[in-house]
Design a protein with these regions (language model features):
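Pyridoxal 5′-phosphate
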Residues: 1-405
Length: 405
């Protein structure tokens, strides 16, 4: 159930957490109250500045413990898009001069990635890099056998998202990491050009466990607004600081990100992460997901859950459900739901409103199915009543459509 900043319940249902998680205003207001008393530049060399700096470093260490990595390899940035660009900027700077001298280098990815990855790779392609797209299965997951075939001595980076932002389906990042590590140790032994492994973890962070060491990752990127934090804030993890800063200036964040960090956003993110872990928010979301699927089965709606048939519970995010509505087009569904105070989306919200239907569903199935598929994003703030309301509304739309045939 949607609430305002004061905690008052609004007669609206927000089911679009994959676009952005509703802000945790309770925590945000608590942190604002604390910072009002000690507001200062965390890089200032006085007591107030050092106090803020201490709070920021506490969050850095907290996140490092959560994802099992060296805290000195975590850098605060404006979010996933900036973090992704920083990874590719490093690769460009490391290899572009060698490409100019006639060498050839590959970057392996999939066509299911977020637009900030795909667009960046197109730019690298223009600069002479070979962009190799690995095959995907019927769920949109990376085909492990095809990945093995495409690794070569020319490969410098593999970039695969942890979970798809439009379907919630997860890639086997641990397995991919093991394959890359094996290749590095056997085929590239002694070479300075080891294959680096990057994963866009924007949808997964705070929902599923990420273990950097176990997954053998060199980079991950995270956006705090996807878990209830503030916009324009997140992290990049870069093993051994394998980065080149995009912004130059005061050498903040160990010289990797110049500019004064957003203390409010960082401290809020730390508190929200604590809340997620301590209150086991994921278990609540799982119950809501099960309830959604039960209510769909009990309803008169003709539907299918995209990319979900046969998957185990640990192979997809409970927070994201892509649903194919056989008799309802996405435009009608979203318009009528919106008019009834129920908010969902069709696909990614990261393309400035240019695309209504899911391009991922179109790639996996076809355009017609994509035009009849909605994305429901569940958050810890949702209720069983929210699920009842959207099912009730979709049933009414279904009845109108079938009765008019």
């Amino acid at each position: 159930m949607l609430k305002d900043k004061e905690g008052n319940v609004l007669n609206k249902v927000y089911l679009d957490s994959a676009s952005t998680y509703l802000k945790n205003w309770k925590i945000i207001k608590e942190v604002i109250g604390e910072l009002e008393k000690i507001d200062a530049n965390p890089h200032s060399n006085h007591t107030m500045g050092k106090t803020i700096k201490g709070k920021i470093e506490k969050v850095r260490k907290q996140i490092a413990e959560y994802i099992n990595c060296n805290y000195e390899d975590i850098f605060f940035v404006s979010g996933g898009t900036e973090g992704n660009n920083m990874v590719f900027n490093y690769i460009f700077n490391k290899y572009s001069s060698r490409i100019a001298n006639g060498e050839s280098f590959d970057i392996i990815t999939s066509n299911m990635e977020h637009e900030s990855v795909l667009s960046s790779l197109e730019r690298l392609k223009e600069s002479g890099f070979n962009i190799i797209y690995v095959e995907t299965d019927k769920y949109g997951r990376v085909d492990i056998d095809d990945l093995k075939k495409k690794l070569s001595s020319k490969t410098v980076l593999v970039s695969i998202m942890a979970a798809n932002n439009e379907t919630g389906v997860m890639n086997d990042i641990k397995k991919i990491g093991e394959i890359i590590s094996q290749y590095n140790n056997l085929e590239l032994k002694g070479s300075e050009d080891k294959i680096l492994f990057h994963s866009d973890c924007v949808q997964v962070f705070g929902k599923k466990k990420i273990d950097i060491k176990e997954m053998k990752l060199d980079y991950i990127t995270v956006s705090f607004h996807k878990m209830g934090g503030l916009n324009s804030s997140g992290i990049i993890y870069a093993r051994d600081k394998k980065m080149i800063p995009i912004l130059l200036g005061g050498n903040q964040e160990s010289g990797m990100k110049s500019g004064t960090v957003d203390a409010l956003a960082i401290i809020v993110a730390g508190r929200i992460l604590e809340d997620i872990v301590e209150n086991d928010i994921h278990s609540k979301v799982r119950e809501l997901r099960k309830y959604l699927e039960t209510k769909l089965k009990e309803s008169k709606i003709e539907y299918e859950i995209n990319c979900n048939d046969g998957l185990k519970e640990d192979e997809y995010l409970d927070e994201i459900s892509s649903i194919y509505l056989k008799n309802i087009d996405i435009q009608s569904a979203m318009t009528i739901l919106d008019a009834n105070g129920i908010y969902i989306s069709g696909g990614s919200a990261c393309s400035s409103g240019n695309i209504l239907h899911s391009k991922v569903i179109e790639k996996i199935y076809d355009e017609e199915r994509a035009k009849h598929s909605i994305r429901i994003g569940i958050g810890g703030y949702n209720t069983f009543e929210d699920i009842d309301k959207i099912i009730e509304c979709l049933e009414k739309i279904e009845e109108r459509r079938t009765s008019n045939k």
